[in-house]
Amino acid sequence: MAVTVKLMALTVSFFGLLSFILGVIAENKKPPAGTPVFGKDGVTCKFPADPTVALGYLSVIFLIASTVVGYLSLFYPYKGKTVPQGVLFKSTTFAVFFNVALFSTGLAATMLLWPTITEHLHLKRNVHLDLTYTCPTAKTGLFGGGAFLSLDSSLFWLVALLVADNAREDFLDEDKDDKLDVELPSLANHADMVI
């Protein structure tokens, strides 16, 4: 099966949508707080079993997959025809969407990793010497915000792919026209010589 723009677009969309869904589920499954168990020397936090940390890491993994496929799809030589990167970046629209896709990917990764790592640390370091410790969990809303940014990121990669495809077609059409212009005068001169 040949790699096409449509296949790459579907792959980017699939990974981006999966990252979004996992991030939203992680937000919904996150417990509001742990239960403090008071001991003689401190507080031990008991947290209910939930898949928040695993879902957060999976969401980040699929965000990375969407980004890698999105980035590679922009510069892939479809039908064996390569286009210089400089040609793509001459398009202002492509440059804008490329940079916005990179920025939104970084922001999405930050907003997904921050609560995931925080929640992971809360689960691992659950003994505290402070008797007033309330056993908090990661901030509410970060998983959801990161999930929506992950979806936005994949959409920006798709738009950049569409703009890159248009720039690629324009470049290849211009290249084809230049070859025809070069060949036609040489044929006319050859015809004059034969007569």
Roles of regions detected by a PLM:
Residues 8-26, 55-67, 91-118, 139-157:
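Alpha-helical transmembrane segments of multi-pass membrane proteins
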Residues 32-33, 64, 120-121, 144, ...:
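Eukaryotic short linear interaction motifs
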Residues 17, 27, 31-38, 106, ...:
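Extracellular/luminal ectodomains of secreted and membrane glycoproteins with large N-terminal domains
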Residues 1-2, 37-56, 84-96, 127-145:
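Juxtamembrane membrane-interface segments at transmembrane-helix boundaries in membrane proteins
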Residues 1-81:
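N-terminal helical submodule of small eukaryotic multi-pass membrane proteins
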Residues 116-133, 138, 151, 155-177:
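Cytosolic juxtamembrane helix at the C-terminal end of the final transmembrane segment
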Residues 56, 70, 134-136, 162, ...:
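Beta-strand cores of modular interaction/reader domains in eukaryotic scaffold and signaling proteins
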Residues 1-3, 40, 78-92, 163-195:
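Intrinsically disordered cytoplasmic terminal tails of membrane proteins
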